[in-house]
Amino acid sequence: MDNNKKIHFIKMHGLGNDYIFVDTEFNTIPDPAKASIEWSKPHTGIGSDGLILIGRSPEADFTMRIINADGLEGQMCGNASRCVGKYVYESGLTTKKSLSLLTRAGMKQLELDVDDNGKVKTVCVDLMEPVLEDHRNSRPVANPCLRVCLCQ
């Protein structure tokens, strides 16, 4: 990785998950796994839970790839997806308040609540029902749909 190359990024957090967000339309990262490992280190890097790559797709308004701090690619993070919604709107990459986001876990719908000054107040995302590998401590719930909103 070229240590002299400038990469434009923003670090954001959602309910304790902090990530480094990079728009791949304007930045190329040849080895995202290596970058995530290096940049996520708290003392010698930027410090984060991982790297989020924001891209474009013909199937969705935006795409999101999650590269965890260990270099492995994740499927979905609700907190990161809400940060993507806030970032793309407040950066002027979209004027839509209802966005589609393609992830490894499938298509997600983001709903943004924006104030009169153009600042995103909340971002809601519908998440899939979690898949638990250990069902011993699970409990049935009335409504399996999970909706997460970012509130200030």
Q: How should these model regions be labeled?
A:
Residues 105-118, 122-140:
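Catalytic phosphate-donor-binding core of small-molecule kinases
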Residues 1-119:
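A glycine-rich beta-to-alpha transition motif near the start of alpha/beta enzyme domains, typified by
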Residues 139, 144-152:
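Cationic, amphipathic, low-complexity alpha-helical segments enriched
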